[in-house]
């Protein structure tokens, strides 16, 4: 799918308005892109034909091509997208079902969508437990390529423009290693005349690039921060996550303490639980001490096995013991329900696919 055209989704609303005159035309284009999910400029019939032709000559509306869609029994959907240069990335649509309990005893069921998107082709971090790392790093995604993942998923699932959607930058790649493009995509997602996904519905997950955490904080984007911690001492963390050699636990904790968090929010610490590696109560004790004084919540994640790994999934009993130790001592802690296991769409299972022979 070769192209040398610019990606129009790389432009913010303001940047598009600077290039397209008069102003109402840029608003029409923005509406076609993010509300009507246009696949081509030719569809934009309320634009003059000459303008449609000029746009088509300079820009593409289709920087990604859907290669495969896999459906999970739990309602999740995994997308494999091909980029213009032949590389591929994956994104996942998660259907979350919440229950609201009312005083009269009634229960209201609500469905909401969370989309897990990628920020890079591959990843440099090289975590021992992550399948994405096995393929190495290829390149960063542009803001438009990040944005297009969500746009295509919303269109494919007929998700209304005003439907509540949460975004998690937890797909392929280290988001803070591509901070400028990720930050720009956050702003594009939040545009009120576009997708209107407020920053507090967007979560950026990082392996702990402390200097970039500080930079992200200074940007004042208003996004949620999630730290992929996974170990409570530097020795084990460096075995699991080689990047710990450059960004150790102490530097991460310092950066988190300086990160701006509003009164109703907490920094999420993600802790991937691996059987007989980091799942005992002594680790829970150290974690409690480590997060003392931080507005934190802990998200325990089951390790999701894949072919060739030596790591094992922990038992449900051990997960609950770990959780109970923390919650009884005042630390907010949840166990993440694994989604998309049957289609390899769960945490740590995304990777770039070779288009011949693997799909």
Curated annotation (Swiss-Prot):
It is found in: Cytoplasm. Its EC number is 2.1.1.192. Pfam families: Radical_SAM, RlmN_N. GO terms for biological process: rRNA base methylation; tRNA methylation. Residues 109-342 form the Radical SAM core domain. Keywords: 4Fe-4S, Cytoplasm, Disulfide bond, Iron, Iron-sulfur, Metal-binding, Methyltransferase, rRNA processing, S-adenosyl-L-methionine, Transferase, tRNA processing. [4Fe-4S] cluster binds at residues 123, 127, 130. SUPFAM superfamilies: Radical SAM enzymes. Binds 1 [4Fe-4S] cluster. The cluster is coordinated with 3 cysteines and an exchangeable S-adenosyl-L-methionine. HAMAP family: RNA_methyltr_RlmN. Reaction proceeds by a ping-pong mechanism involving intermediate methylation of a conserved cysteine residue. Belongs to the radical SAM superfamily. RlmN family. This is Dual-specificity RNA methyltransferase RlmN. It comes from Sulfurovum sp. (strain NBC37-1). The lineage of its organism: Bacteria, Pseudomonadati, Campylobacterota, Epsilonproteobacteria, Campylobacterales.
